A protein has these predicted regions:
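Extended hydrophobic/aromatic segments used for targeting, binding, or gating
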Residues: 18-74
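Conserved loop/turn motif of beta-propeller repeat scaffolds
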Residues: 39, 86-88, 131
Length: 198
């Protein structure tokens, strides 16, 4: 209602003659975004009891709230995007105003950080659920947009394209991340970007 992001969830089994909708999450208790399924386990991104986001699974054969499982728990960093790959769950976080991608193995839920050490913003993640390859865009204060391909199976990353700006070389500039303490002691992340010869 209005700008309220909370939602209910219904599903329909098209394999049966009775095609009536079945309530899975009947209460307005949070935001639930359906990600996909692994058999009878339905996976959701949710902010239910997790303001910064988490991933849960609900078995449609045993959907009571007490049986919900947390697959990826809430962290101190905001979970901003989730994609299902063939063998991994891709989680994009905002950590100190920079993007970070973690991959969780669907079977063991062991996690690994992708081998991409640039600080900045990742966007436009594109993939399919039958592949462990995904694509993304990257930019920061001194780097024009770049597009990468990442293979989660062998951790190989390839630069596919980068925007060329006439008379501009990113290597001529420096961008540093610093942390400034506020009055209450909280460390505030900030960037200082400048030309090398200044």
């Amino acid at each position: 209602k209005g700008t309220d992001e909370r939602n209910r969830v219904f599903y329909q089994d098209l394999r049966t003659e009775n095609n009536s909708f079945i309530e899975l999450i009947p209460e307005l208790i949070g935001q639930f975004i359906f990600l996909g399924n692994i058999g009878s386990e339905f996976l959701f991104f949710t902010d239910f009891k997790a303001p910064k986001g988490k991933i849960i699974s609900i078995n449609i054969n045993n959907p009571q709230k007490t049986n919900w499982k947390t697959l990826v728990a809430e962290t101190d960093d905001a979970l901003t995007r989730v994609e299902l790959l063939d063998n991994y769950i891709l989680c994009q976080y905002l950590k100190d105003v920079s993007s970070e991608i973690l991959l969780f193995n669907k079977k063991t839920f062991s996690k690994k950080k992708i081998s991409f050490d640039k600080k900045g913003i990742i966007s436009g993640i594109t993939t399919t659920q039958d592949s462990d390859v995904f694509y993304f865009s990257f930019t920061n204060y001194i780097q024009p947009n770049e597009i990468y391909q990442y293979n989660a199976t062998n951790d190989r990353i390839n630069l596919l394209w980068k925007k060329q700006v006439p008379d501009y070389r990113p290597a001529d500039y420096i961008s540093k991340q610093l942390f400034y303490p506020s009055k209450d002691g909280t460390l505030i992340p900030m960037y200082i970007s400048y030309k090398k010869d200044i």
